[in-house]
């Protein structure tokens, strides 16, 4: 995939000042962002996360998923580490888009789980692609990662591109009564690696 680097600016956040790097897919015009913190070292594994856009969770504070909680936890961990990165990929609704995601939520309100809802709309359970990762990481100077994720597909995608995943760090935050069924489906049907933390009351 051809991805064009556009520009870099400062991004002040509650956890510190990140650098925000803009990218554009040349074939589609789709825009993605890389956040970096501190001085990245291409010879060492960098703490990082690959985060797919979730307007409802990231910006509207939805409790239906754990996305917003994961985004904030990842940014805080990177800042506390003193260096790291976060790739923010514009793949709303596991790749089906915002309006289709709302349609899927409507089906979930009627009893479907997150996978069933996507499939009833004619989509695969997870439509996301990760081809844009390699040129983005190359631009910011990352070749080895300590990846914050519960999703084995992200680990496999990076390894298939020749990026060394030195460690997978679980990111288990944000469980609540509205998303417990969703989290169980991600574990049982999408293969996400989660501990019993998600499935028992604290």
From Swiss-Prot:
SUPFAM superfamilies: RibA-like (SSF142695). GO terms for molecular function: GTP binding; GTP cyclohydrolase II activity; zinc ion binding. GO terms for biological process: riboflavin biosynthetic process. It is an enzyme of class 3 (hydrolase). Its cofactor is Zn(2+). InterPro entries: GTP_cyclohydro_II (IPR032677), RibA (IPR000926), RibA-like_sf (IPR036144). Transmembrane segments: none annotated. It comes from the Bacteria. Its EC number is 3.5.4.25. Binds 1 zinc ion per subunit. The keyword Mitochondrion does not apply. Pathway: Cofactor biosynthesis; riboflavin biosynthesis; 5-amino-6-(D-ribitylamino)uracil from GTP: step 1/4. It holds the Pfam family GTP_cyclohydro2. The active site is at residues 126, 128. Keywords: GTP-binding, Hydrolase, Metal-binding, Nucleotide-binding, Riboflavin biosynthesis, Zinc. It catalyses: GTP + 4 H2O = 2,5-diamino-6-hydroxy-4-(5-phosphoribosylamino)-pyrimidine + formate + 2 phosphate + 3 H(+). Gene3D superfamilies: GTP cyclohydrolase II. Zn(2+) binds at residues 54, 65, 67. GTP binds at residues 49-53, 70, 92-94, 114, 149, 154. Signal peptide: none annotated. One of its GO terms (cellular component) is cytosol. HAMAP family: RibA. Belongs to the GTP cyclohydrolase II family. Catalyzes the conversion of GTP to 2,5-diamino-6-ribosylamino-4(3H)-pyrimidinone 5'-phosphate (DARP), formate and pyrophosphate. This is GTP cyclohydrolase-2. The gene is ribA.
């Amino acid at each position: 995939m051809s991805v064009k680097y556009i520009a870099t600016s400062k991004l002040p956040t509650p956890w510190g000042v990140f650098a925000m790097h803009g990218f554009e897919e040349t074939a589609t015009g789709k825009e993605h962002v890389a956040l970096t913190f501190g001085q990245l070292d291409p010879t060492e594994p960098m703490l990082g996360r690959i985060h797919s856009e979730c307007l409802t969770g990231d910006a509207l504070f939805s409790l239906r998923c754990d996305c917003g909680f994961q985004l904030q936890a990842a940014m805080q961990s990177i800042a506390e580490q003193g260096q790291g990165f976060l790739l923010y990929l514009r793949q709303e609704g596991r790749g089906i888009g915002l309006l289709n995601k709302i349609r899927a939520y409507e089906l979930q309100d009627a009893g479907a789980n997150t996978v069933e809802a996507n499939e009833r709309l004619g989509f695969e359970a997870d439509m996301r692609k990760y081809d844009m990762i390699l040129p983005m990481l190359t631009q910011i100077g990352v070749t080895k990662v300590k990846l914050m994720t519960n999703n084995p597909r992200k680990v496999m995608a990076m390894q298939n591109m020749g990026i060394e995943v030195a460690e997978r760090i679980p990111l288990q935050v944000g469980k609540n009564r509205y998303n417990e069924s969703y989290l169980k489906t991600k574990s049982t049907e999408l293969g996400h690696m989660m501990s019993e933390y998600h499935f028992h009351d604290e």
